[in-house]
Amino acid sequence: MAKPGTRTRKKVKKTVVDGVAHIHASFNNTIVTISDRQGNVLSWATSGGSGFRGSRKSTPFAAQVAAERAGNAAAEYGLKNLDVEVKGPGPGRESAVRALNACGYKITNITDVTPIPHNGCRPPKKRRV
């Protein structure tokens, strides 16, 4: 039985105006993460978590759906402006940015942060199919 004197505090939602959308577009999946400027994650979504499996995960439409889901979840924080950081060579790069724009966010700048080696590790051998 609960004690009569205990009270639970109502959780206060913080309001964030500016945020950063990190889009990681690999050949197999697209991960969209929306955070504040300090890097605290507000929401995230993936193509696989949006109901797409197998080769449909790596389509531009799956990336669009994932970006819409992440954008709608981040709207609870009062987000208005987004910087977009795109990483990776996948097919969902452009469509994820367009979907975030369609969600009503003002996109202030788009940056490509794909890691490029300065002749680092040896790449894997070519596939023979």
Swiss-Prot record:
GO terms for cellular component: ribonucleoprotein complex; ribosome. PROSITE patterns: RIBOSOMAL_S11 (PS00054). One of its GO terms (biological process) is translation. One of its GO terms (molecular function) is structural constituent of ribosome. Disulfide bonds: none annotated. The keyword rRNA processing does not apply. SUPFAM superfamilies: Translational machinery components (SSF53137). Keywords: Ribonucleoprotein, Ribosomal protein, RNA-binding, rRNA-binding. Pfam families: Ribosomal_S11 (PF00411). The keyword Magnesium does not apply. Located on the platform of the 30S subunit, it bridges several disparate RNA helices of the 16S rRNA. Forms part of the Shine-Dalgarno cleft in the 70S ribosome. NCBIfam families: PRK05309.1, uS11_bact. Belongs to the universal ribosomal protein uS11 family. Part of the 30S ribosomal subunit. Interacts with proteins S7 and S18. Binds to IF-3. HAMAP family: Ribosomal_uS11 (MF_01310). This is Small ribosomal subunit protein uS11. It comes from Marinobacter nauticus (strain ATCC 700491 / DSM 11845 / VT8). The gene is rpsK.
